[in-house]
Design a protein with these regions (language model features):
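A conserved amphipathic terminal alpha-helix motif
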Residues: 123-159
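A structural signal for short, well-ordered beta-strand segments
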Residues: 12-16, 119-121, 143
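Hydrophobic ligand-binding cavity/cleft-lining segments
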Residues: 1-46
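Conserved strand-loop elements at the edges of beta-sheets that form or border functional pockets
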Residues: 16-18, 53, 76
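Short beta-edge strand/loop motif at the mouth of beta-sheet-based domains
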Residues: 30-71
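Solvent-exposed alpha-helix faces
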Residues: 28-32, 79, 148
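Hydrophobic-ligand binding "helix-grip"
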Residues: 49-50, 64-114, 122
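Hydrophobic pocket/interface hotspot
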Residues: 23-27, 59, 74, 85, ...
Length: 159
């Protein structure tokens, strides 16, 4: 009998020069301001990317023709400290409600005007060994640039 595949999580963090509540708000309500509109899985061109700010809310891409594509579902909503999403994208970067890797984002005040943002993307095993490893490698390369876009927008809009 084969041992279950264990796939290492992806961990990324950034210190944002912005107060805690603002840092959380930019990550969630301000998604269109920092997420690259050419970086999507649904119909193109993308007009906006948004997060429904509640438990059970969705991360959505909205195309210029109004087509909505769900990327993730929020399974934990604790503003301004934490949110967790089930990432519903397959290894071919297509929406797939059967995929269930998770993105856990924590926000911790680091003084009155700074926030430590820690992102954990894990549970790639739920995708199967080969697709899970492929997704893990892709997001390990992708999240650093995305988190940098986010940090720049949070700091710019906090000034």
């Amino acid at each position: 009998m084969n041992a279950p595949t264990v796939i290492a999580p992806v961990r990324k963090s950034v210190r944002v020069k912005a107060p805690l509540a603002h840092a959380f708000d930019v990550f969630t309500s301000g998604l269109t301001r920092w997420w690259p509109l050419d970086h999507g899985v649904g119909k193109k061109p993308i007009q906006k990317v948004l997060m429904e700010p509640r438990l059970g809310g969705r991360w959505l891409e909205i195309a210029e023709d109004g087509t909505q594509t769900s990327v993730a579902t929020i399974i934990l909503w604790e503003p301004p400290h934490r949110l967790m999403m089930v990432w519903q994208i397959n290894a071919q970067w297509k929406p797939d409600l059967t995929m269930k890797s998770e993105v856990d984002v924590r926000f911790t005040a680091d003084g009155p005007n700074a926030t430590l943002v820690e992102l954990l993307h894990h549970k790639f095993e739920t995708m199967g060994a080969e697709p899970g490893i492929s997704m893990r490698n892709d997001v390990d390369r992708g999240w650093p640039g995305l988190i940098e876009h986010y940090a720049q927008e949070a700091e710019r809009s906090s000034a």
